[in-house]
A protein has these predicted regions:
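Bacterial N-terminal signal peptides
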Residues: 8-17
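Signal peptide processing junction and immediate N-terminal pro/mature segment
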Residues: 17-28
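Serine-esterase "nucleophile elbow" of acetyl-processing enzymes
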Residues: 32-105, 122-128
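Cell-envelope and extracellular/periplasmic
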Residues: 33-40, 105-111, 133-143, 197
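Oxyanion-hole/transition-state-stabilizing segment in secreted/luminal serine hydrolases
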Residues: 53-54, 66-68, 73, 96-98, ...
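Structural recognition of the beta-strand scaffold that forms the well-ordered cores
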Residues: 64-69, 102-107, 130-136, 167-172, ...
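Active-site segments of SGNH/GDSL-like serine hydrolases
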Residues: 135-138, 158-189
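Catalytic His-Asp segment of secreted/periplasmic serine-dependent ester chemistry enzymes
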Residues: 175-259
Length: 259
């Protein structure tokens, strides 16, 4: 049963395996946001800030973003449609043309928060991102990891990333109406919010965002019939939302954004 839940969750957001990088697989430019991507402003705001992102943009330094997550970070055979790529495209569109933006992905397939956090010291020695977006919680919920142990692992992971000099955004679980009665997500959602508050870092509430889209009829996340096409649309909207979330959390002035 647990394996089926994991499979359903991964299929929902579009990835059973990371796509193979191909030369010339360029990220398409950002287009006007479709109506399906609309969200209430409270889901895209945070009282916590991203000072290192702000400093990099103000100084005209490259903005390197590392997304650490599971296979749901990607879409098979369509890397340019995944939410990290769509975030990059939207940041490039919104930030000054002179600002170099690069988003890379570190896949931690089927790993708990504790297992992922244990890799952060070496990972941050090999990379020097301005911002790390850590997508976590789904595997822990599926495996019914003790919520207190989960919170401790997320705390340790955030501390390691901050010690290495990066801003951090936590991204919580994905929402699926097909599996919400099969796993207990709330303890993990609550603990991620607590850790974010304790460390004064932004929490990108992917769970609430996807539930909003489903409840308002913008996306039918219950039906599996549209598969890859639905995944691309959801990823596009997530990428747009993340880009705006990062810009707002960095408190960039209008002069530091494209008009």
């Amino acid at each position: 049963m647990k394996a089926k839940v994991l499979l359903s969750l991964i299929l929902l957001c579009g990835g059973l395996a990371a796509p193979v990088a191909r030369a010339g697989d360029a990220t398409p430019a950002a287009s006007p946001a479709p109506a399906a991507c609309e969200l209430p402003s409270y889901l895209l705001t945070s009282e916590s800030q991203l000072p290192k992102v702000a400093d990099a943009v103000k100084a005209g330094k490259p903005l390197d973003i590392l997304v650490v997550g599971s296979r749901s970070t990607t879409i098979p055979s369509s890397e340019s449609s995944s939410y990290p790529a769509r975030m990059e495209a939207n940041l490039k569109e919104k930030l000054p043309a002179s600002e170099a933006v690069h988003v890379s992905v570190e896949i931690q397939s089927k790993k708990t928060a504790e297992e992922t956090a244990s890799t952060f010291v070496k990972l941050m020695e090999a990379k020097t991102p301005t911002l790390v977006i850590w997508q976590t919680g789904t595997v822990d919920a599926i495996r019914s990891i003790d919520p207190d142990e989960f919170r401790s692992a997320v705390t340790d992971g955030v501390a390691a990333l901050q010690k290495a000099g990066a801003d951090v955004v936590l991204m919580n679980l994905q929402y699926s109406p097909r599996t919400e009665t099969m796993i207990s997500a709330q303890p993990f959602l609550d603990n991620m919010r607590v850790v974010a508050q304790e460390h004064d870092i932004p929490l990108f509430d992917r769970f609430a965002i996807m539930r909003q889209w489903n409840d308002q009829g913008q996306f039918d996340l219950f039906s599996p019939s549209r598969g890859p096409e639905l995944a691309k649309q959801v990823h596009d909207c997530l990428g747009r939302a993340l880009a705006q979330f990062v810009i707002d959390a960095a408190h960039l002035e209008p002069a530091q954004q494209q008009n």
